[in-house]
């Protein structure tokens, strides 16, 4: 079900990516201690979503050089394992170009840091996207409230998958991250 404000938007309207928060020292959204970028914009509208405030792509703050530098300052710390893109949905159409460029820049500047990405989209529908060459782990699938399980690691509902992106691209089949 698409949120009403998205139905009112023009599909040709292009905005700079916006975000709600940059979380530092996060241990819940991927392996190790991480920095998390919570982007604005999501058209999945999952019932029971933990972050419905991030659905509106015009909410939050504009992702600018200062925000990027804030992420880079964290990634400069040896104890930070990497960055996680969440939201909202980093693969929301209005975010894809900016998040791909950011992921590319992070991989070039910090090749030993990992990039995790959470999306409501399924692997099979995004496997051809350029961003995946920079992503290490992808958590795919919409959150389904009826399949919610708080004991699951790195995901909210049992239908979601935690995918090793590079191995999956290499083998041509979904390889789960362990």
Question: What function would you assign to each model-found segment?
Answer:
Residues 16, 112, 134-135, 159:
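A generic structural signal for alpha->beta connector loops
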Residues 41-45:
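Short pre-active-site segment immediately N-terminal to redox-active cysteine/selenocysteine motifs
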């Amino acid at each position: 079900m698409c949120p009403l404000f998205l139905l009112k938007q023009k599909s040709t309207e292009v905005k700079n990516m916006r975000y709600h928060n940059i979380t530092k020292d996060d241990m819940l959204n991927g392996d190790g201690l991480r920095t998390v970028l919570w982007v604005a914009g999501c058209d999945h509208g999952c019932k029971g979503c933990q972050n419905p405030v991030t659905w509106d792509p015009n909410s939050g703050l504009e992702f600018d050089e200062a925000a990027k530098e804030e992420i880079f300052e964290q990634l400069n710390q040896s104890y930070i394992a990497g960055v996680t893109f969440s939201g909202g949905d980093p693969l929301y159409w209005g975010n894809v170009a900016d998040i791909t460029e950011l992921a590319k820049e992070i991989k070039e500047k910090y090749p030993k840091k990992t990039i995790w990405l959470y999306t409501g989209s399924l692997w099979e529908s995004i496997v051809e996207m350029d961003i995946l060459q920079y992503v290490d782990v992808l958590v795919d699938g919409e959150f389904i409230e009826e399949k919610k399980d708080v004991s699951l690691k790195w995901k909210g509902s049992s239908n979601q998958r935690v995918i090793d992106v590079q191995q999956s691209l290499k083998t041509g089949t979904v390889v789960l991250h362990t």
